[in-house]
Structures are given as C-alpha cells and as structure tokens.
C-alpha cells in the first residue's frame, strides 16, 4: 500500500500546509508508518492535484500496489484528485476539509471526523456513484441558477481592497438580488421534458452544496439515482423564507417534499438530467464541486459506483452499516 497527501496552500482562508505537515507526520508515526510509506506534495497551480494523483496511481499500478490519496483543500482539490485516478481500480481518494465550502463531507459525517487524522488513517474505502457533468466530474451536486450566479460573482468582489471572503459573498448576493431574478429553463429528466420558471436547481448525488445548503437531505450517493430539486421562481419577499427552508433541508422529509415546500419545489429521481435556458437571455451559470462557469446547456449523467473514496473510521462504519441495511431490504 502506498500513501499520498496532496496539500493545496491556496484553498480556504489561510495556508493549511504549515500546521498540517507536522500533524500528518505525527499521525503516520502513530499508525506505524515509516517515512518511506508516504509522500506529501504541495500543489502549485490549478489542475496540479489531478496530475499528481494520476501519476501516482499509474506508478502504483505498474508496481502492483494499491494507493490511498488524501487531499487537503476544498471540494475542487478533492475532485481534481478523483478525476486524476479515474480508470485506476487500485486508487482511492479521501478529503481533509481545509477549503471554503467543504460540502463533500456533509453527506458522510462531520468536519471533526474528517479533520481527525488518526480516524482518517484508520478508515476504509467505499465505492460511490459519480456525476459526469458539463463542468467535469462531480461527487456531490451540479447546480444552476441564483446560487451559482452568486458563486460566480464572488471573485470579482474579492479584487476590491479590504473585501474578504464573507464580504465578497454578501456583495455578490446583493448584486444578484438587485438584478432580474430567475430564468425560464427547459429540463429533460430521463424521458420527461418540462419548462419551468426557475430560481435555481440542484442535481444531487450528495446532500449539500454552497457551503451547507441541504438541497437533498436524504440523498444516497451509492443508490444509483440522482435527486433532482428544482426551486420555482418567486418574488424577492419570499426568497429569504425559501432559502431558510432550503438551507436547513426542511423542504424534504421522509422521501417527499413537505406540504409547505410543494408550491415552491419540484422533485424528481433520475439517472440523466439536461437543462437549457428557454428565455433567450444567454447562458445559465452552473457550478459543480468547486467549478463554476456560464453554460449554453448543462448535462449531468450518473456513473454508478465509479468512484472509490476514503472515509474516516466513524463515517466508514456508518456507511457500511447503511449499505448492509439497504442491501438486506
């Protein structure tokens, strides 16, 4: 078994490498690893984690070894490594959450579990579904609409002096709320086609995105289905109430939309989803696991059980127990 840590110093509010490198070495020693058992790399540019992960997986495969990779950064760094190891059955990827969103872990456990290096090294490998999207591979959620527009606008405000992460986020929200809200969008959900006046939508393999919005609070990332949540366009006075419900996951309980949510939400289960603007206003902004861009059309296709991930020990035990329960039904 080979072990690799990929640390992204540009993720989050501060460089995680200074504190993490000695902590990794100490945890490795407690696990009985020698210095030759693992490697620590610091990424230097966008896409570097993908390159390093792929090279390591290929080298391990040629030697007949298995490989475990942990990324330290955000969801984008994690998905870079996941993309890099695609096609290598010998490799699995885990996440140390030191980015700004860290939504991947919310489907499986808590931040405390995922930052516990001893639990990470003692954890196990599981197989999950992945999403192939217009923005690349995703383990969690592909979304479009108001929330994606807010995310897309943040970098512009970060360039303003003394405008940090939270202020940039608030300014981007204000900008979007001052503009025209919502889009008319045509969805193709498996064999169903519908056109909706849409505030935003989420195609979900995992449960959360956008820094903790529980779009699909009961999503199972290994059940072979996507949970599709479409939020209808509403007036500005209703948005705050709607977003509060959406963030807390109170719109969806026991496998269905709540009565309070039904006027505002549409829910479907599918394996393939496509959407395109139907209002003649140009591209729609979409986001998926750290990537964000305007798109003329967005497509998300389920890739069943195509991702091999690492979970810290408590999360791994819960995942295995749940899968055993589901399989027994």
Q: Where do the protein language model's features map onto the residues?
A:
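Glycine-rich beta-strand-to-loop/alpha-helix junction loops that act as flexible
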Residues: 9, 72-74, 96-98
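ATP/NTP phosphate-donor binding region
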Residues: 1-69, 316, 323-329
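Catalytic core of DAGKc-family lipid kinases
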Residues: 43, 87-203
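Glycine-rich phosphate/pyrophosphate-binding beta-alpha loops
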Residues: 143, 147, 202-217, 291-292
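Gly/Ser/Thr-rich active-site loops/lids in small-molecule metabolic enzymes
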Residues: 158-168, 211-212, 217-240
């Amino acid at each position: 078994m080979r072990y690799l840590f990929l640390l992204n110093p540009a993720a989050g509010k501060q460089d995680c490498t200074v504190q993490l490198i000695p902590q990794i070495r100490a945890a490795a020693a407690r696990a009985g690893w020698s210095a030759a058992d693992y490697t620590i790399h610091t990424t230097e540019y966008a896409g570097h984690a993908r390159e390093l992960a792929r090279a390591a997986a290929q080298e391990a495969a040629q030697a007949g070894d298995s490989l475990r990779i942990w990324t330290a950064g955000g969801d984008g760094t994690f998905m870079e490594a996941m993309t890099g190891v695609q096609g290598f059955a010998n490799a699995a990827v885990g996440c140390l959450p030191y980015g700004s969103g860290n939504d991947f872990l919310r489907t499986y456990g808590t931040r405390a579990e995922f930052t516990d290096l001893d639990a990470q090294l003692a954890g196990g490998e599981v197989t999950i579904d992945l999403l192939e999207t217009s923005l690349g591979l995703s383990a969690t959620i592909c979304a479009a609409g108001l929330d994606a527009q807010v995310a897309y606008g943040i970098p512009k405000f970060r360039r303003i002096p003394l405008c940090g992460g939270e202020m940039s986020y608030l300014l981007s929200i204000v900008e979007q709320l001052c503009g025209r809200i919502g889009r008319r969008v045509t969805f193709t959900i498996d064999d169903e086609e519908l056109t909706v006046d849409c505030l935003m939508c989420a195609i979900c393999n995992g449960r959360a995105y956008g820094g903790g919005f529980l779009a699909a609070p009961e999503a199972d990332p290994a059940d072979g289905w996507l949970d599709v949540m479409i939020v209808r366009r509403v007036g500005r006075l209703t948005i705050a109430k709607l977003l509060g419900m959406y963030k807390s996951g109170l719109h969806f309980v026991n496998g269905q939309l709540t009565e309070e949510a039904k006027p505002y939400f549409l829910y479907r289960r599918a394996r393939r989803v496509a959407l395109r603007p139907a209002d003649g206003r140009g591209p729609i902004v979409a986001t998926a696991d750290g990537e964000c861009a305007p798109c003329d059309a967005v497509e998300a296709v389920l890739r069943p059980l195509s991702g091999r991930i690492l979970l810290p020990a408590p999360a791994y035990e819960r995942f295995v127990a749940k899968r055993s329960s589901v399989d027994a039904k």
